[in-house]
Regions:
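Conserved alpha/beta enzyme-core scaffold
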Residues: 2-555
């Protein structure tokens, strides 16, 4: 007979609520400071000192645009003898105090996605041994890990308004807040939200109060950056030429109707060419209808001209609030009229829901691997790796996706267009197409297990330079891909790998196209082709609804 199961001794029985008990203990330590869930502004620093433990994993809301800066400034003032060696999870390192935490020893380890404004200082702190990098992630990768192996102990986030029950209204810049809060709250972590004000009735509830432990009114409105605003005054004739070639040789050729534009003047030029050059080609209604995109001011002329059907946004953009409210057929807005942005959902849309990602890069090697990480500058990638790859889980077909089928087989699959834009030389005459990415050396020096590559070459389908377009997906074998890229690399070291005869062969086979092959006249490619040539022009296009930040005003 089988023996009866033996119950484990009570002493060996596991405890199943340790995280909840630990949270209750921490909350009890600060209960005397709070009125319900409301912490007084003056008590925040004291509360953080009581809530945090050495080595805690802290998710700090430094997003692309909005920053929980009252929380980060207060955190940076804590006594490192009591709170130290924190593991910081932050999507965008944007503010000086984010790195003050490492200089003071309050934080030790960092997992992040983007560090544009602070990239030089990040590199220096790594070199000095003050900062350890776990990994440079794409946005959704970092948030995914918050649900798996980087679960936060504490989350420090920001919102526009709260009520006395802790319900949050995030307004146009929802961005990453719901994801960070959910990952923390439902693993019995502590969530503190700084808000601009506490009011009786919220315009809408974006995050329920049952997910929030404390709200605190900040000493000033949370910081927000107009990260995606590009002044058309700075778009060059060369960028206009590249934009015209991209429209003719990619957008029109494949009928790209759903897309994401990366940040930069290259893509801003394309947005401003749609109502002029695109209109002259009869492309309205055929391309660029549905977007996963922040509300770029440079998209205003295309919207006003009837090109755009919808825009789902990662975040908002300073000054675009009134314009968005006045265009509810285009943007995702709530009953209150304000934008509902969501970075994770928009990244998902940009990964699986669009036909094309197109964006700029700082450096590319001969295999089309690209990175924004260069010597002395650890920038990170943001969302580019997520949207700039071919998601092999995709199963729905669109005309653009199907056109990239190259195999002749009963079982075939289409492919997402992944387009990289770069001028062959950076400012100062430094080649942008190089034998080896700086990222390889940066990764080695920083002790990273792999080089911090932004977009891997085998995901890139097209490369656009001022010389022309390389249709890499058509290549038969790695060497032919390298030759096609070299054909548009100008007089860089990569460009010198092929001779004129080989370039002509590639042109004849459709792997390379120059401006003349596309019917684009370089003489026509100048700033007069842009629908708006200044911020003032964008304001005029918007009917005065766009209110640019002061730094972009010249009137």
């Amino acid at each position: 007979m089988p023996s009866e199961p033996v119950a484990p001794p009570c002493a060996q029985a596991p405890r199943w609520a340790r995280r909840g008990a630990a949270k209750a203990e921490r909350l009890g330590a600060v209960a005397h400071l709070a009125d319900g869930c409301v912490l007084p502004t003056r008590s925040l620093e004291q509360a953080l000192g009581l809530l945090l433990r050495p080595g805690d994993r802290v998710a700090l809301e430094g997003n692309n645009q909005k920053q929980a800066d009252f929380l980060s400034r207060s955190l940076a003032r804590l006594d490192p003898a009591r709170v130290h060696d924190l593991h910081l999870l932050i999507s965008s390192i944007s503010r000086p105090e984010h790195l003050d935490l490492f200089e003071r020893g309050i934080a030790r380890r960092l997992d992040f996605s983007f560090a544009g404004p602070q990239s030089l200082r990040v590199a220096q702190l790594i070199e000095d041994g003050r900062l350890e990098v776990g990994a440079i992630h794409t946005y959704v990768e970092l948030y995914a890990r918050m649900l798996i192996d980087l679960q936060p102990d504490v989350a420090l986030v920001c919102a526009d308004k709260a009520d006395a029950q802790g319900n949050l209204y995030t307004g146009p810049n929802t961005e990453d807040t719901p994801t960070i809060v959910e990952a923390t709250a439902f693993r019995q972590g502590i969530v503190i939200a700084q808000v601009n004000e506490i009011c009786g009735e919220l315009p809408r509830v974006d995050i329920p109060g049952s997910w929030i432990d404390f709200v605190v009114v900040a000493d000033r409105p949370f910081a927000i950056e107009p990260l995606f605003t590009r002044d058309p005054r700075h778009i060059t004739d060369l960028q206009v030429l590249m934009g015209m070639m991209a429209i003719r040789g990619i957008y029109e050729r494949y009928g790209v109707s759903s897309l994401n534009h990366g940040i930069g003047f290259d893509t801003a030029a394309i947005e401003l060419l749609l109502p002029t050059y695109g209109e002259s080609l009869g492309l309205k209604g055929k391309i660029c209808r549905n977007w996963a995109l922040n509300p770029h001011p440079t998209l205003i002329p295309a919207i006003e001209s009837g090109w755009v059907e919808s825009v789902h946004c990662f975040g908002s953009e300073v000054g675009m609030e009134r314009y968005i409210e006045a265009r509810p057929d285009i943007f995702f807005v709530g009953r209150d009229g304000s934008l509902r942005s969501n970075r994770v959902l928009c990244q998902l849309a940009g990964q699986y829901g669009v036909d094309m990602f197109i964006g700029s890069t700082l450096q590319m090697d001969g295999d089309a691997n690209s990175s924004t990480v260069t010597l002395g500058r650890l920038t990170g990638f943001g969302g580019a790796p997520n949207m700039g790859h071919d998601p092999r889980g995709r199963r729905h077909a669109t005309p653009a996706w199907l056109q990239l089928i190259t195999a002749d087989s009963p079982v075939v699959r289409g492919r997402k267009l992944v387009v990289q834009l770069l001028e062959t030389f950076q400012s100062g005459g430094v080649p942008a197409l190089v034998e080896s990415l700086d990222a390889v050396e940066v990764g080695r020096r920083s002790g990273m297990p792999i080089a911090p590559v932004m977009i891997y070459g085998d995901d890139v389908t097209h490369v656009v330079t001022e010389e022309g377009i390389a249709y890499l997906y058509k290549a038969q074998g790695q060497q032919e891909r390298r030759d096609a890229l070299a054909a548009v690399a100008g007089v860089t070291p990569i460009g010198q790998r092929v001779n004129a005869q080989r370039v002509e062969q590639l042109r004849q086979r459709g792997l390379v196209a120059f401006a003349s092959d596309l019917g684009v006249s370089p003489l026509q490619a100048n700033r007069s082709m842009l629908a708006a040539r200044s911020i003032e022009d964008l304001v005029a296009w918007s009917g005065g609804l766009y209110e640019p930040p002061a730094r972009f005003r010249s009137w």
